[in-house]
Regions:
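Basic, glycine/lysine-rich polyanion-binding surfaces/domains
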Residues: 1-175
Length: 175
């Protein structure tokens, strides 16, 4: 079974672990799932979503690649803007949903569902033009901070002011 970069930390925090999408993932901690649910709904919860697929597509053909494989006008995205969209097959049928973020004119980051990532990445690779490169970021952690106090947690713990960060926007921060 695969593990995320945070696996040892989950074990140290005595998480109850279970298989999900081929990964040994935490499903709850000692406080219990109900307490965790309420904490996240009232405050903020941090989730390890590193099992999801993460890819970087860059190069002169990157934009054309996304415009071919999704029905979205990815070219209209400004830099540091994300779009929830779908990955389509040759007939326009939906393969999976994903989030594509435009980082620069020719550089994109995408997050793909865990259960389908191998199939999705293979489809992407088979449609990649010669003037674009796809990197599967397998060893990178991915965290989701959720809840009404998420903005405050970012500010208090990392000094990040996300108050002006809009919906589906991206911000880089080095710690």
């Amino acid at each position: 079974m695969k593990t995320t970069p945070l696996h040892a930390k989950h074990l140290a925090l005595k998480a109850k672990m279970a298989e999900f999408a081929g990964y040994d993932m935490p499903i709850q901690y000692e406080t219990g799932v109900l307490a965790e649910h309420h904490w996240t709904r009232d405050k903020a919860g941090l989730f390890d979503v590193s099992h999801m697929g993460q890819v970087m597509v860059q190069g002169a053909g990157a934009l054309a690649f996304w415009e071919k494989l999704t029905p979205s006008a990815i070219g209209k995205l400004g830099n540091d803007t994300a779009k929830y969209t779908v990955l389509t097959n040759e007939q326009g049928g939906i393969i999976d949903d994903l989030i594509v973020t435009r980082l620069a004119d020719d550089k994109f980051f995408a997050v793909i569902n865990a259960g389908c990532k191998d199939k999705d990445i293979a489809w992407m690779q088979s449609n990649l033009p010669d003037n674009a490169k796809l990197l599967h970021l397998e060893d990178r952690a991915l965290l989701a901070l959720q809840g009404p106090k998420a903005e405050k947690v970012l500010h208090d713990s990392l000094g990040i002011d996300a108050s002006s960060l809009g919906y589906m926007r991206f911000m880089k921060h080095d710690t």
